[in-house]
Amino acid sequence: MSQVLDARAGKITPEMEKVAADEKVDVEFVRAGVAEGTIVIPRNTNRKVLKPCGIGRGLRIKVNALIGTSSDRDDRQMEMRKIAAAEAAGCDSFMDLSTGGDIDEMRRLTLAHARVPVGSVPIYQAAIEAIEKRGSIVAMTPDDMFAAVEKQARDGIDFMAIHSALNFEILERLQASGRVTDIVSRGGAFLTGWMLHNQKENPLYEQFDRLLEILLKYDVTLSLGDAIRPGSTADSLDGAQLQGMIVAGELVRRAREAGVQVMVEGPGHVPLNHVETTMKLQKSLCGGAPYFILGTLATDVAPGYDHITAAIGGALAGTVGADFICYVTPAEHLGLPTEQDVKEGVIAARIAAHAADLARGNRQAWERDLQMARARVALDVEKQISLAIDQEKARSLLDGTGEDGVCAACGTNCAALVAARYFGMN
């Protein structure tokens, strides 16, 4: 049985109970959301997730971190340190995007070390192995693609980004209209090259039922990869992107009918005036499926600060519909991230998620902000630190900054102290 089929049968699973307790909502609310497809709980039947999370309507916005080796840097111990740094910073899930070294071993290490759900992009491994065995990505076979999905599912991957919502109709629209940045999704580029070279339809689209059978077998959550997400603000909301949303919506319905949990990925670089339209279109076209967004990067001109551009766009996107934010680090567009980059990316995404949760009326978010406000008025340093999104940084700045009962920033002229003294406010 899958989470979806259990939910439709009226059964409440241990994962649903954990999500409900964490979110402080009724477990029946979670069960109903899983049953109708507006909530997913990534969890492979071959893996015990110590900290499961629910993603979707009525729940807190979650944050995903990326790790993985590459041909330029195959340092598995560094990736383990990144996992520790990201979990300490409060991420809700990981995706292993490894393309270098022993990909199987890296995945198994990630699954063993991470306490949260772990995702992957199987087409990466299929493509790299095609290069190693046959000299070219376009030499992949459909069986190679599905074998990678099966192997990673068997190992315990909880959710997979799979670019099924890409077909020749979308590519023809893209070629006819043109783009500044064409295709920036790596998986999308691999498949596009394969399709155009071989003049064959995307197997992950054409044989979608075959894919669903594998995912259902292990209760892997399908994350419909956004193969043609905009790579620049100039390309946002073009015809190809909209056609991709329509196809994704059709596949969401088929996945739900098969009993497979499914969410949809987007959007990349999106100017702020396009964010609300993008979110509402996706929710409408995809039947309210959870929306998993990269960023959203609100401008193209801030290399070195793209964790900030992504937090700006991500906060707005979360406010109007996004459910799951994939972090962006300061190294985006510049190089491979360090452990510190990973931490800063998670913190920035968590700030965006929390700000959006406030705007959405999430009670836990509002209670946390209220407690922080009270702690500041009371000059309760320890309470302020415990409530901070980045507790380590808050402690480094607040510890030893002044006497007890004296504001660290304002001293004896603190507005809160003056107000309390003369107006009896506290």
UniProtKB/Swiss-Prot annotation:
Zn(2+) binds at residues 269, 333. It comes from the Bacteria. This is 5-hydroxybenzimidazole synthase BzaB. Binds 1 [4Fe-4S] cluster per subunit. The cluster is coordinated with 3 cysteines and an exchangeable S-adenosyl-L-methionine. InterPro entries: ThiC/Bza_core_dom, ThiC/BzaA/B. GO terms for molecular function: 4 iron, 4 sulfur cluster binding; lyase activity; metal ion binding. Belongs to the ThiC family. 5-hydroxybenzimidazole synthase subfamily. Its cofactor is [4Fe-4S] cluster. The lineage of its organism: Bacteria, Bacillati, Bacillota, Clostridia, Moorellales. It comes from Moorella thermoacetica (strain ATCC 39073 / JCM 9320). It catalyses: 5-amino-1-(5-phospho-beta-D-ribosyl)imidazole + AH2 + S-adenosyl-L-methionine = 5-hydroxybenzimidazole + 5'-deoxyadenosine + formate + L-methionine + A + NH4(+) + phosphate + 2 H(+). Substrate binds at residues 95, 124, 163, 185-187, 226-229, 265, 292. It holds the Pfam family ThiC_Rad_SAM. [4Fe-4S] cluster binds at residues 407, 410, 414. The keyword Metal-binding applies. Keywords: 4Fe-4S, Cobalamin biosynthesis, Iron, Iron-sulfur, Lyase, Metal-binding, S-adenosyl-L-methionine, Zinc. Together with BzaA, probably catalyzes the conversion of aminoimidazole ribotide (AIR) to 5-hydroxybenzimidazole (5-HBI) in a radical S-adenosyl-L-methionine (SAM)-dependent reaction. Is thus involved in the anaerobic biosynthesis of the benzimidazole lower axial ligand of the cobamide produced by M.thermoacetica. Requires BzaA for catalytic activity, as BzaB alone displays no activity. The gene is bzaB. Its EC number is 4.1.99.23. It is an enzyme of class 4 (lyase).
